Design a protein with these regions (language model features):
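Extended, charged low-complexity segments
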Residues: 238-298
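Short glycine/threonine/proline-enriched tight-turn/helix- or strand-capping micro-motif at secondary-structure
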Residues: 12-49, 66, 148-153, 186
C-alpha cells in the first residue's frame, strides 16, 4: 500500500527528496527528507511537524559514527489526528531533538524541537526531517520497513543544459545559478530528464535514484517496462517503475571528475544544480559545465 503525502504536508517545506540518501529506509521511495529552510550552509534548526496528532513516544537512537556529528539521533513517533489524511497510520520522524513528549498534542507546522546533524548525514547534506509512514502493526523502531510514498503535489520538470555559474560554495559542494526556479514559492521544481520526469537522488554517489512525475510506459505483457534515463544525452541508468539504478558512471565538472550531483525537488528561489565536490573547489562566478561519463568512456 502506498501512502500519498498531501500538499498540506509538503507545502510547509522548501525542499524534499524521496531518494537522495544512502540509507535503505529510502529504497523505493519509502521515506522522504523534508527541508524546512535554506539558511546559510543549510543549517536551519526549525522542525515543523509534518502532521497534526499525538506524540506516542520519543527516544534516543544510535547513529553511525562521524567526526562531525554526535553519536546519537532522535526518533519521534506520532499518531496522526483522526481527521487528517494519515489517520490510522504511524508517522516516524528522525533528526529532531524533541521539545515534545509522549502524550503531547501537536498541530501541523508546530515545532517538534530542534533539527540536529546526525551521523546519518554526509557533510554536504542540509538539515532536514526524515519522515516515514507505517501501518500501526508494523515495528516502528526498525530503520527500514516504511510504506512507499506518493506525492500529492505536482513537480515541474525544468530543462537544464548542464551549465551554470557558481553562486554559493561550501567545503564539500558548489551550487549553480541554473536551472533557475521560474516562480519561487508557487510550486516545486526539479531537474528534467531527457525523456521527461524529474530526477531525484545522489548521482552516482548514492546507490540509486528516482524519476518522478512521469507516467510509466507499459510493455506488451502489460507490466511496467524498464527504461533508460539520460540527461543531456548522457546515460544515467535504468528506471524500473520510478526507481533508477545508476550506471557505473562519473559526473564531471569542466571535464574533471567530482563526487556527484545532488538532485531534489524545491520551491525556493535558491534552487539550482548542486555539485558534490569535496575533492575540488570552485570560485563564485565560475562557469561550469556538467556532464556524466560512463565507465566505458574513462
Amino acid at each position: 500500500m502506498a501512502v500519498t503525502l498531501p500538499e498540506s504536508v509538503l507545502a510547509q517545506y522548501e525542499r524534499f527528496s524521496l531518494y537522495n540518501s544512502p540509507y535503505p529506509a529510502h529504497d523505493g521511495g519509502c521515506a522522504i527528507d523534508l527541508y524546512p529552510g535554506t539558511l546559510a550552509d543549510g543549517r536551519t534548526t526549525a522542525a515543523p511537524s509534518p502532521v497534526a496528532g499525538t506524540v506516542r513516544e520519543t527516544r534516543t537512537v544510535r547513529a553511525p559514527p562521524k567526526p562531525y556529528a554526535p553519536e546519537h539521533d532522535h526518533l519521534i513517533l506520532i499518531d496522526p489526528a483522526a481527521s487528517g489524511p494519515l489517520a490510522g497510520l504511524t508517522v516516524r520522524v528522525l533528526h529532531v531533538e524533541p521539545s515534545v513528549a509522549a502524550g503531547d498534542r501537536v498541530e501541523r507546522g508546530e515545532s517538534l524541537g530542534r533539527l540536529v546533524r546526525a551521523g546519518f548525514f554526509a557533510p554536504w547534506v542540509d538539515n532536514h526531517l526524515h519522515v516515514g509512514v507505517r501501518d500501526p502493526d508494523q515495528n516502528p523502531y526498525r530503520a527500514s520497513g516504511s510504506l512507499p510514498l506518493e506525492l500529492g503535489v505536482s513537480v515541474r520538470p525544468l530543462e537544464w543544459d548542464g551549465t551554470g555559474r557558481v553562486v554559493s560554495t561550501g567545503d564539500t559542494y558548489a551550487v549553480l545559478d541554473s536551472p533557475a526556479h521560474p516562480d519561487p514559492g508557487a510550486a516545486f521544481v526539479g531537474v528534467r530528464a531527457d525523456d521527461g520526469g524529474v530526477l531525484d537522488g545522489g548521482l552516482p554517489h548514492y546507490d540509486g535514484g528516482g524519476l518522478l512525475e512521469r507516467p510509466a510506459p507499459v510493455d506488451t505483457a502489460g507490466a511496467p517496462a524498464e527504461r533508460v534515463v539520460s540527461l543531456n544525452g548522457d546515460r544515467l541508468g535504468v528506471a524500473d517503475g520510478r526507481t533508477i539504478a545508476w550506471d557505473d558512471a562519473t559526473v564531471t565538472a569542466n571535464g574533471e571528475p567530482i563526487t556527484g550531483l545532488s538532485l531534489f525537488c524545491a520551491r525556493d528561489a535558491d534552487f539550482g544544480a548542486k555539485l558534490i565536490c569535496p575533492e575540488r573547489s570552485f570560485e563564485r562566478g565560475e562557469l561550469v559545465r556538467v556532464r556524466v561519463r560512463s565507465s566505458d568512456e574513462r
